[in-house]
Amino acid sequence: MSRRSKYLKRILWGLLLTPIVLVLLVSLLLYVPPVQNFVVHRLASYLSEQTGMQITLDRIHLAFPLDLSVEGLDVVRAPGDTLLSVGELSLSPSLRPLLDKQIEVPHITLDRFALNYTDSTGLSTVRARLPKASVEELYVDLEKERVDLSRLVTRGGSVSYTSTDTTKKEDDSEPLRWLIRTGEVDLQSTRIDVAMPLDSLFIGADVTRLRLDRGEADLEKMRFQIARARIEGRELSYAVDRTPPRTPYFDPSHIHLRDIYLEGESIDSEGMRLSLLLSRAQFNERSGLKLHHLSGRYEMDSLGMCLDDFLDTDGSSMQGALTMPWSVLRSDPKAGIELTMKASLGTRDLLLLSYSALDDLPEGKKLLTAITRRQLLAPIRLSLETHGTLSALELSEADLHWPDVVRLSLKGHLTSLLDEHRRSGRLRLTGQVGAKAQTLLSLVSPELARDYMIPSPMTLSGEVDIRRGVYKGDLKAVEGSGRVALKGHF
């Protein structure tokens, strides 16, 4: 081979290898700290020009092969208005999967994260603060749109959302098709606040710990599944305005729960469909109402709901099952209903829950005080079993027992419940009046108590016949050797 051919061959090889060498050289230079600092400042300046915001980045450190850490990232929209701040972000993605459009990161740590976002209308704001978070074994497949996450842990932090916007958003964008799977999510010491004054909604939560095991989110179907969830919280509040509660009793417009514990399993939600097994729930309400235990299975979809649960408070307990379609709420006469319930309702709990209604009555407060003073606080026991439809309902059992006051039992059937002109049926009634019935009458209606005396003990029996909206009663009252027949209609 001639000298000229060798010379041309060297030039050709040089031309071919030069881009590769340059790429390798630039790659190697990126591991040199002075070069990294130069790139950081150039990148921050470029992004600031493109976004119109001031972006500063203190330091980027890249170690072989891809150990990356970012420190001191700040995105400022205007002086004193910081949109985003990151104290430190560290991650080490694997190199080989990147060539296949996949991201594998064994470990990610995030320190001192802050977000302060206001939408373009200035009516909605989101503020978030996260002192520390870590992610383990993150896998992202960009082509299949799938995310797998072994573990996510956060410590401390707060999230607040405020909105005075009532316009309905129309979203014509394509739905997200990402599938996200998580092994364990552990959020510790988190504060959540939501304020929507124009919607009369104010929510605050101080969550000690929220743990989710084996979760899956299909964003295309909007289906969310969680194998197990546990929530521990110091407090949870709901209100319709910012004013303090008017009464020390239970106020449904100002609910404040403390010492909260919730545990559920097999949670599955998609649209109107929801099913879950509530293993345990307990809390204390500001009014003094204490829920010691609540458990059961809940299922609902677009057609109806099914509940099977047990409840226990300081003075009450309840166990039962309910199955009904949503069409019952639309007065569908063919809607089937099944209900069984056994309950012991503490009078104190009933007073706490009904205080707001009694407080509006002229003698409401006096009645509450008198019931307590006259020792009428024995639990009221209820037993109910019914099935059928709104056009034909069978009442298998309906018992009420208020010790020393009254005991009543009803059985029978009803038809055309929704039409007062066609409503018909027959109910059999038995009961007994106790020694404190007269005391209760004197509290509810002192005028009647002065004119009438309720004998005790007195038994009741008879029937109520309903035909086309006309009620006819045929009852007998017996006290010792005395008998009274009561007949009437309306």
Regions found by a protein language model. Give the residues of each.
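Flexible beta-edge/linker motif
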Residues: 59-164, 173-201, 206-208, 213-272, ...
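Feature captures outer-membrane beta-barrel proteins of Gram-negative bacteria and organelles
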Residues: 294-298, 412-416, 487-490
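Beta-propeller and related beta-repeat scaffolds in trafficking/envelope systems
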Residues: 123-128, 167-176, 200, 205, ...
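Outer-membrane beta-barrel proteins
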Residues: 58, 81, 125, 264-266, ...
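Transmembrane beta-strand segments that form the barrel wall of outer-membrane beta-barrel proteins
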Residues: 190, 276-281, 303-310, 393-400, ...
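N-terminal type II signal-anchor transmembrane helix
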Residues: 1-52
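Outer-membrane beta-barrel pore domains and translocons
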Residues: 155, 312, 344-346, 399-401, ...
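Solvent-exposed loop/turn segments connecting transmembrane beta-strands
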Residues: 81, 284-290, 313-319, 402-408, ...
